[in-house]
């Protein structure tokens, strides 16, 4: 290969590399939770996914009543039945008020309502707000984190929990 051909090839490679952004990188699974009801029945799975500096929660739920259900990240990785109160309150490292409709905006544990269809299933993926490093440190702290699904919809305003009712499913987030 001549020097000129090598220079052209190297230039082309650099142009292609310059067009690749962090957003083009594939998602990496960094955590997961198996959701269960108070009676121990499977209620779905949740995954924490990383794409560059974005962390998202992907959830697939089964066996829930049709309609909207609040779901949140909770402060403690413990899902003791029957009421799952062992999971603590919402994950709120910045000590903000609850709900996307609150004047201060939502906290880390606030997620949009999960919409369950007539077939009793739901799935969604939600991006979390903040840097990936900070989010992962908060989720994988010493006492862990749980994902909780509630019986009713979150009203996005009532502090501290959104008035979403009883906790009907819970899963402890484990690092992948």
Per-region residue spans from a language model:
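N-terminal leader/targeting pre-sequences
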Residues: 19-68, 73-176
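Sec-dependent bacterial lipoprotein signal peptides
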Residues: 1-17
């Amino acid at each position: 290969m001549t020097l000129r051909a090598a220079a052209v090839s190297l230039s082309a490679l650099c142009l292609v590399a310059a067009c690749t952004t962090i957003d083009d990188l594939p998602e990496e699974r960094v955590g997961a939770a198996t959701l269960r009801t108070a009676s121990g029945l499977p209620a779905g799975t949740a995954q924490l996914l990383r794409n560059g500096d974005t962390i998202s929660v992907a959830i697939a739920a089964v066996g829930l009543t049709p309609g909207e259900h609040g779901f949140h990240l909770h402060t403690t990785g413990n899902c003791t039945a029957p009421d799952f109160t062992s999971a603590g309150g919402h994950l709120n490292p910045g000590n903000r008020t609850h709900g996307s409709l609150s004047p201060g905006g939502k906290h880390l544990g606030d997620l949009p309502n999960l919409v369950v269809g007539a077939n009793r299933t739901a799935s969604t993926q939600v991006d979390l707000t903040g840097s990936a490093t900070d989010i992962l440190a908060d989720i994988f702290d010493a006492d862990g984190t749980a994902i909780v699904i509630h019986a009713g919809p979150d009203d996005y305003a009532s502090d501290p929990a959104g008035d979403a009712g009883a906790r009907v499913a819970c899963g402890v987030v484990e690092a992948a």
